[in-house]
Regions:
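Alpha-helical scaffold/interaction cores of sigma-54-like transcription cofactors
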Residues: 1-166
Length: 166
């Protein structure tokens, strides 16, 4: 009985710790890239943060951030700005998963319901290096596969398709 309680407690603490780390990284990332958010962006960011946590996607997004950071540090490559399924997400932009040249051109925020229905989300790299990104992911033991001939990296609830911009 005590072991069950300990496991539940450990799981709850781990989840709380992950949520706090997620919130911190998102908020810090936004301020680091764009400065203190205006009240409008602050509301967008906090609303999106809360919804992502409600959907239980914080671990996946932190893992995707680690993946993108790993590609950046190992290969010096970043996703192509303003392309892909996540560039309308302030959270993804704040985490460095997606890029946008000018925050003032930020459009309609991402619908996470729509993204979850898709399940496979695209991140774009230039055509000539996309295969190197996929090989790097395999070397670093990310869970890779293909879907309709396109390379994907699998996370818990989301899959990332490594797309090429031609």
């Amino acid at each position: 009985m005590a072991n069950k309680k300990d496991k539940k407690r450990k799981d709850a603490l781990k989840k709380k710790s992950t949520i706090e780390a997620f919130k911190f990284q998102v908020r810090w990332g936004f301020v680091n890239q764009f400065g203190t958010p205006s009240s409008l962006y602050s509301v967008f960011l906090e609303t999106e943060l809360d919804y992502i946590i409600e959907l239980g996607l914080q671990e996946d997004l932190l893992s995707i951030k680690r993946f993108i950071d790993d590609i950046k540090s190992g290969m010096g490559l970043e996703p192509i700005p303003e392309l892909g399924d996540l560039y309308h997400s302030l959270v993804a932009i704040s985490l460095g998963i997606a890029k946008i040249a000018d925050i003032n051109k930020f459009g309609i925020p991402t619908s996470w319901d729509e993204l979850l229905k898709k399940k496979i989300l695209s991140i774009y790299y230039p055509d000539e290096i996309r295969n190197q990104v996929v090989e790097h992911a395999k070397e670093k033991n990310y869970n890779t596969s293909t879907y309709l001939g396109q390379p994907i990296v699998k996370f818990n609830q989301l899959y990332i398709k490594i797309s090429r911009k031609i």
